[in-house]
Amino acid sequence: MSMFSTGVSALNAAQQGIATTGHNIANASTPGYHRQQILQTPAIALDTGSGFIGQGVQVTTVSRQISQYLETQLLQVQAQSASVNSYLQQIQPLDNALGGTSSSTNGNFNLSTAIQGFFAGVSAAANNPTDVPSRQSLISSANAMVTEFQTLNTTFQQARVGVNTQIQDSVSQINSYATQLANLNQQIILAQAGAPPGQVPNDLLDQREQLTSQLNQQVGTSTVIQSDGTASVFFGSGQTLVIGNQAFSLQTAVDATDPQTLDVNYILGNTKVPIGANNITGGSLGGLLAFRDQTLDPAQSALGRVALGLASAFNTQHELGQDIKGNAGGQFFNIPPAVAQGNTANVGNATITTTVNNPQNLTTSDYRIDFNGTYTITRLSDNTVQASGVSAATLAGAGVDIDGLHFQLASGAATAGDSFEAQPTRGAAGSLSVASTINTSTIAVAAPITTAATLGNLGTGAISAGSVNSPNDTVAITFTGAATYNVVDTTTGATLATAQAYVSGSPISYNGWKTSISGAVAAGDVFQVSNGATSKTNGGTAAVIAPAVISVLPLNPNLQDKITVTFTSPTTFNVVDTTTATVLAAAVAYNPTTGAAITFNGWSAKITGNPATNDTFSVGPTISGTADNRNGLLLAQLEATNTMAGNTTSFEGAYAQLLNQVGNKGNELNVSAATQTQLVTQTQAAEQSISGVNLDEEAAKLMQYQQAYQAAGKYLETVSQLFASILAINP
């Protein structure tokens, strides 16, 4: 190489350095840009025999300054940060509406206040049972509470609509990024095909990595660089989004058994493959799905459980009372049955409903019902089978009781392969209302029976106020032989029957329910009835008890018959229904030390003390229009009674649990979001320290290359002058 060539190589190297530095300066603010620099190496020296003489410089490549480790770390923390922030953005409005602990207002607890206001109205009506304004105030507070339930449920529904819209938007963005990545892969293939070996299109690689970063903020992905320089992108449980110049797409679809839920499907040719939400993690889409499945659904169901539990328990007690006109209490709240959603692929026309029959056992779970000749019911919260082999006749007749719910085949018939999803609590708060029959005269504050001791009694005996037996009471049926049994209301302690004659297969009816036992019974067999649910608790026979059917109120047609209890001695008494002139019991043993619980015609009372011979006590109907408030007091007591979650908490306690669950999750996400933001900032700083453009450094390099360029020019000028001098010499 001549001296001219050496100078030109220096000039070219400086020129490329200046061009690359200018490129860096121009893209200092370009997202995803990685600083570039030229790599210079000496040209091969010339062996002159008296030593190797250098022949200038060559630029071997223009390289990107990149740490693949930091790039991977940045993608991971960005995906996690996007997921957490997406979740947080969804939960904050919900938490604010509930009045939770992570909200900026830190809680108004509107529903809790409404519940307290409702029961304050119940107490006021109970304390003034004949006061019409107090009754009207109770109705107003009931409507206010129902409105709060409905408003909160609307908030949940709006959140669900918003989540579905954002899921669709996120899927659309993912598809767009995947298509752009596939196109860039194609451009990279073409660029590298015409380039010398080892040379890469830096700017195209930057664009691809920027797109990968944007994609990763929508959904967590992993990237593998192939031998041809293309990037393959995977997500979920290994599904391919991009391979070479081919992009695969996602699609949203309405869930087959839940029209309010969007599923994400992976499109593989003409096949749609559902991707479980738990397989989609990271990015905004992962956060949206996590919010929906982990907070929105459970929280809305928890709200519905409070609404159903309160309304059902209140209805049950209200139906045991008497209104101001002497009529039996009816339903105070209207609770429409929940209809299980049939799968869109179902062939049959079966309709399955759920109603509440035991509010204390309600859960927040949904249930799947499958039919393959018989019905199987699975609780979805823990994916456990709760009932199997249930015939269509059984489901249409007695039905099935699970977790405080009564499942019933309301109409039609299923075809093998049909399935349904029951969501008994989700959305229940929105369907609650005060019954249209409730007005100031139909509120059942009074008890339907009244007890009294005859004024002329000589002993010290007394009779309790008495109460109506509830179908929710737990009752034990104990067989003393194959043809006799005793019945005890274990909730109240009252003996309902002693030595009752039994004919095999004949119905047994107490407290407003009716059941039957199939198979041979024997002494020692014990069966339990609790709110319609039945079980065998003792005994070695194969006898089976059927589910109890609760009758329409009044629970006992003889409830308000006039009853007289007459002591034939200080230790024995007779019971006579004077309305029907029927002797209900004779020579009943009485222990003055413990007293005696008596129950007939659907009521229970207790006699205590030391009655004298011929002392009498009466039980009869409460006179309409009197200031009796016993049922009102029982209704008011429901506020502080643990009637929810297996009798472990009250209505307000169950709502407080909902607040804590949402609020605690919100607080957790606030902390996590701050942490993730800090991690992103730190990782970006570390990545930029290697890949970012520092304008001060570039200015220094520009001066360096400028000086090199000028020096190379001066060198060429000197060489040119030397050659000119030589050429000017005359031979």
Range-by-range predicted roles:
Residues 1-731:
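S/T-rich, low-complexity, solvent-exposed segments of bacterial secretion/appendage proteins
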